[in-house]
């Protein structure tokens, strides 16, 4: 099949007008949040003008101020979004008003070609619209949500009675031979934006896994927008002093004062407290440690796309081996199970696969040795199938 026909056959429709409406609703909601952030920023600036604040409190306030300012700037950038996509929306509306309707019986080749060209123009606008989302940090979730709606191949028609096997002009639900104009039914596997709310449970689990893994990547770099109560830092500082883990010489910088403090130490202290209110911050340990000690977080931004691609492959292999089975055990040695492997366990293994240096102690993995061995067994098998390098060195 020529490149021309392949392009037409390999793209699925996306209703960017509905997506645009969803984005407008999101921007309206965010506008209310910005009012709250601006009020918070005023209070922070007032506090910073006070005298005799402890250095750690000043540092914390400056961090909060920086985060608020960043979020406000990112929101104000959304003011340019409507201007940026206005011409695309207008062209899309015009194409909708000039929709090509084929006669029910025996459409001519010219009519089919006109309809195909019309669809190509719409799909080109859809791609341009989705590419615009990449320029706006606040709209990344919309870009991620729509990825699965693009480039979904349709079923290929059987050979035509005239002998043609490749030259077809395809519509949503039919294919017409470009040589003799014979029409065939075509089962379409496309999805639209409205289909997002009607995905089956398997797709829901897959989506939730990936969202959870993305959160894990964000938390590992300490980039999540989570508010950590000031009491947490006060408790940590008190406990670290009790354990003689702080350098108490006068005049030291924050980095020097906390240079002996590791993430594992901070996590151990939080666990010692045994409080349910504290337990919910375990996943934020990197952010807490960085804010407290000013020690830098690991930056894996350059690997994020590769990690997400690897995760997709790993998930698909896992489902084929352990979930999508008719019988409890099959010839590949899989055992049907529902739960996926620990996200931080997976992140560590994928970072090691890409030869990224990282400390296994920085990952919240599994408590019991039996569970660790079980995860190693599963993960090693998946990596072996995918022919990836596997590492055992994780706590």
UniProtKB/Swiss-Prot annotation:
One Pfam short name: Pox_VLTF3
Entry keywords, A to Z: Activator, Transcription, Transcription regulation
Disulfide-bonded cysteine pairs: these are: none
Establish whether keyword Transferase is in the entry: no
Q: GO biological process: what's one of them? A: regulation of viral transcription
Q: Which superkingdom does the taxonomy of this entry point to? A: Viruses
Q: Which InterPro entries match?
A: Poxvirus_VLTF3
Q: Which family does it belong to?
A: Belongs to the IIV-6 282R family.
What job does this protein perform? Transcription activation.
Name of protein: Putative transcription factor 079L
The organism is Invertebrate iridescent virus 3 (IIV-3)
């Amino acid at each position: 099949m020529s490149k021309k026909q392949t392009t037409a056959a390999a793209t699925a429709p996306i209703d960017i007008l509905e997506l645009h409406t969803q984005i407008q609703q999101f921007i309206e909601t965010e506008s209310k949040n910005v009012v709250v952030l601006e009020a918070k920023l005023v209070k922070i600036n007032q506090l910073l003008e006070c005298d005799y604040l402890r250095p750690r409190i000043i540092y914390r306030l400056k961090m909060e101020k920086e985060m608020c300012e960043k979020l406000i700037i990112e929101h104000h950038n959304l003011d340019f979004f409507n201007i940026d996509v206005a011409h695309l929306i207008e062209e899309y509306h015009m194409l909708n008003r000039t929709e090509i309707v084929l006669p029910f019986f025996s459409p001519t080749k010219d009519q089919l070609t006109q309809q195909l060209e019309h669809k190509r123009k719409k799909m080109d606008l859809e791609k341009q619209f989705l590419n615009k989302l990449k320029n706006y940090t606040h709209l990344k979730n919309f870009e991620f949500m729509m990825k699965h709606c693009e480039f979904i191949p349709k079923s290929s028609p059987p050979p035509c009675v005239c002998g043609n096997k490749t030259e077809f002009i395809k519509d949503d639900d039919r294919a017409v031979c470009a040589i003799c104009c014979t029409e065939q039914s075509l089962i379409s596997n496309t999805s639209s934006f409205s289909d997002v709310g009607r995905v089956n449970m398997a797709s829901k689990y897959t989506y939730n896994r990936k969202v959870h893994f993305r959160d894990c990547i964000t938390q590992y770099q300490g980039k999540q927008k989570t508010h950590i109560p000031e009491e947490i830092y006060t408790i940590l500082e008190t406990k670290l002093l009790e354990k003689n883990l702080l350098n108490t010489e006068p005049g030291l910088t924050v980095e020097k004062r906390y240079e002996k403090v590791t993430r594992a130490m901070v996590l151990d202290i939080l666990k010692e407290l045994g409080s349910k209110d504290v337990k919910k911050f375990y996943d934020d340990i990197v952010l807490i440690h960085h804010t407290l000690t000013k020690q830098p977080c690991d930056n894996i931004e350059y690997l994020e796309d590769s990690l997400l691609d690897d995760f997709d492959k790993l998930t698909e292999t896992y489902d084929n081996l352990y979930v999508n089975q008719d019988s409890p055990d099959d010839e590949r040695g899989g055992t049907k199970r529902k739960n996926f492997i620990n996200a931080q366990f997976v992140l560590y293994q994928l970072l090691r696969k890409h030869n990224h240096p990282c400390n296994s102690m920085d990952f919240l993995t599994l408590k019991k040795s039996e569970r660790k061995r079980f995860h190693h067994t599963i993960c090693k098998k998946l990596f072996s199938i995918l022919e990836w390098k596997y590492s055992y060195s994780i706590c």
